[in-house]
Amino acid sequence: MTAPFLQVEGLSKRFGDHQAVADLSFTLARGAMLALLGPSGSGKTTTLRMLAGFEQLDAGRILVEGRDVTPLGPAARRFGMVFQHYALFPHLSVFENVAFGLSKDADRASRVAEVLRLVDLAGFESRSIGQLSGGQQQRVALARALAPEPRLLFLDEPLSNLDPSLRERTRAELRAALKQIGITTILVTHEQEEAFALGDLVAVLKDGRLQQLGTPTELYEHPQNQFVATFVGRASALPGTITAPGRVRVGDVDWPTAGSATGAVTTVVRPEDVVFTDSGLPGTVVERRYLGGRALFRVSTAAGTLEIEAPMASAELEAKVHVTARRSLSFNRDSV
């Protein structure tokens, strides 16, 4: 079995009485992209700073290709970093910004040209930073981080300064460039859509603790607890009872479910998991939101409030409705 490229073991960090990161462990294969996802204060940035060597660990160790790099400073670790606000030098040209961390030898110009081609900025060498758009500045920051050929790349909220219309296109460009280079990458974000678009794996953090690590599909389809279910995508959490293998009772009706727990559970219902029907769990539409070709409904039931995404053709239905599951639902084992 191939050894992991990056091995993180038991990272912990406390600031006074606040436990910022607690016993965090994971592994990452060479060339993989990991997104650290969580709300503000979940420990994402502290984790990134510990990995980069900017923050001292209280406990744990970091191994790269089997070598313990924990005692090394940031420069000796040979990791690259793209900061949230890019930290570009406005008085320097694009070339000078990208070349800033390179030794002044004969290969300097060719290396700058190479990384600018990778980020689709060939020919921009003489431009000033002020002449660039936000997306172009982000790519200059990426080129500068890649120029010294780091072993590992860190991205701290890399797209947060871009407007929504530019962000989606830049995500695709960023992922394509990093996959072409084949560099192992860890990024921090608080946006689920960004984590799913960029990460091969996503680590969900809350209060400094790892809640779940998996592919975007695994996190969305099989959340391990209620926090992950409701933080990753839209979801309604309703009390339920497992009545038989593969069946969960929500309100007065039985719905299909995945898993083998028994007794009281919290049932996780995605907006696309349920549909309007002629019979099933009765409810009342309390809110409608239009989403272009589809609509999002909030339906009050005896078991709790559900969100349902349905075609616009459903928008004219009466307030009194019935809903039923269209596929197996997820649940966690926390007793309600």
Which positions does each model-derived feature cover?
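Helix-to-loop junction immediately C-terminal to a conserved catalytic motif
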Residues: 52
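ABC ATPase nucleotide-binding domains
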Residues: 76-80, 84, 88-227
